Amino acid sequence: MIDDTYNSSPAAAAAALQTLYSFDDAAERIVVLGDMCELGASSQMEHEKLGSMCDPNLLAWVVTVGPESERYIAPAARRRGCQVHIARNAIEAGEFVRSVTQGNAIVLVKGSQDTIYLEECVKVLCNMTEDVRLVRQDAQWMAKKEAFFQQFK
């Protein structure tokens, strides 16, 4: 597991994806990509560019979370020939990845913080009971996330 859920930018996401590709001993590689926020007018271009970096020869799955990722990363990755799953939220993404992961998989989880909350995907994948090591776990963040995830119930 590569937990890079604190925040994201085009350069950081590209570097994280290249790091995932560098693991030679992985039976499979899965990437969970969330929106990169605060990109303004360049959002479409940057999300599409990241999607086009997804290599079907190196990735078993591309999982997206967030509206920009659904609109731009997912189609670009599909055009490259990748298997893509669009998740409604981070928890659903974690459940999906857990259902398709086999044996020696390496999973990269990368996205911006606001309304993406990919640390919750990591929590699902790791079956974590003690989550103090994850980002955004204090009472204020947990209340904000609880309110956010209510829309999916």
Question: What kind of feature is each model-predicted range?
Answer:
Residues 1-153:
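ATP-dependent carboxylate-amine ligase
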